[in-house]
Amino acid sequence: MAMASLYRRSLPSPPAIDFSSAEGKLIFNEALQKGTMEGFFRLISYFQTQSEPAYCGLASLSVVLNALSIDPGRKWKGPWRWFDESMLDCCEPLEVVKEKGISFGKVVCLAHCSGAKVEAFRTSQSTIDDFRKFVVKCTSSENCHMISTYHRGVFKQTGTGHFSPIGGYNAERDMALILDVARFKYPPHWVPLKLLWEAMDSIDQSTGKRRGFMLISRPHREPGLLYTLSCKDESWIEIAKYLKEDVPRLVSSQHVDSVEKIISVVFKSLPSNFNQFIRWVAEIRITEDSNQNLSAEEKSRLKLKQLVLKEVHETELFKHINKFLSTVGYEDSLTYAAAKACCQGAEILSGSPSKEFCCRETCVKCIKGPDDSEGTVVTGVVVRDGNEQKVDLLVPSTQTECECGPEATYPAGNDVFTALLLALPPQTWSGIKDQALMHEMKQLISMASLPTLLQEEVLHLRRQLQLLKRCQENKEEDDLAAPAY
């Protein structure tokens, strides 16, 4: 039987007051005069409707991240880097969110993973007076925004748990403005703050924990430039377990007498699909949408990526890893890696799963930047359902000296493996029985020995690794704090 269709819902008023009503406008004007609508204009500029009935958490976070001008570091569609619900999948698969919705802890995890600074509180960890102070703080600033998760029933609305940004506050009336992302259902509306607290102070049946609110602001550092961890592939749980449990056990239980032996033990037991877990961040663009030259912005980002890559190559750990991999006949193919990246790029640009694509051919070429500097571009011909699309992949490279002269080197398994080992917590190596070797290994991965840009890259990976570890252990609902480095 076909489901009956619905066109919006009537907003129960009271207790809510429609933002666009005469009274709603008056409340807005009063709050504007008092300075507690400062965050509203940023939020309303990026306000969106959730694209799926259960995407309220993803839509709310997307609105806030874009309002804060946080760069996602990867493209959404065409040439544009932009947060969209479809990109918020590092802590919970989109298929699961689409079917079941998302919990408070998982949205907090997503905000951390997306590079934001987050302070999150359940009502059991705060008071209504503290909540009111936080609302005033966020609504009085353009640099901090709040997302609330609450039960609709308290407002006599249909539905249960919901997420939405808080867009303003009227102190005289003690009312908060909810920018409801389910705009197909209810418009933005004012509610008494005490009632909002009551709606948050309810139990989420899926977790058994109280709901709450989070304050989101720009980070002190931007997300990673060259590397990122991903849980899009189901194998990430196996890989995270290997890194967290198996590596410390392997290096403590087996006889290791050199750094190369440690690398050998870790590498030879590494799950074969580890490259689905840690990836280099590729710059993708549709060929026909771009000219043949690098833009100033593309050149700037590529230059930073190349600097990070150069710093990885200059670490002592990379030299050990490169030496070991050369003895086992490990080889990397730029065209193979690029073909995979082109398929993933086509997935992002089209919104279709990458398994529906195949890369028929690739072509490596050099193109000019604004100041005649060169960049490497791999053009891939991606095929889906018989239709072809050309995708450009901008590849960072560094120059290395060999017997025949300067040679370009690109992101490959050796530097990715180096970044992964640098991201592991220092205590990973504490079980090495040879004290001198343990000290040497800890020196190799010490943050103090790394240049500033690479330090930030490694800190980003460590942060992601800790967040994914929380998800793997189902602790994201218990631990809402930012990861400790």
UniProtKB/Swiss-Prot annotation:
One GO biological process term: arsenite transport
Effect on the protein of changing D89A: Slightly decreased activity
MF terms (GO), sorted A to Z: ABC-type phytochelatin transporter activity; ATPase-coupled arsenite transmembrane transporter activity; cadmium ion binding; copper ion binding; glutathione gamma-glutamylcysteinyltransferase activity
Keywords: Acyltransferase, Cadmium, Copper, Metal-binding, Transferase, Zinc
Effect of D204A: Decreased activity
List of catalytic residues: C56, H162, D180
Keyword Transferase applies: yes
Recorded catalytic activity of this chain's protein: [Glu(-Cys)](n)-Gly + glutathione + H(+) = [Glu(-Cys)](n+1)-Gly + glycine
Domain Peptidase C83: 1-221
Function per UniProt: Involved in the synthesis of phytochelatins (PC) and homophytochelatins (hPC), the heavy-metal-binding peptides of plants. Also involved in glutathione-conjugates degradation.
PANTHER family: GLUTATHIONE GAMMA-GLUTAMYLCYSTEINYLTRANSFERASE (PTHR33447:SF2)
This protein's name: Glutathione gamma-glutamylcysteinyltransferase 1
Organism: Arabidopsis thaliana
Taxonomic path: Eukaryota, Viridiplantae, Streptophyta, Embryophyta, Tracheophyta
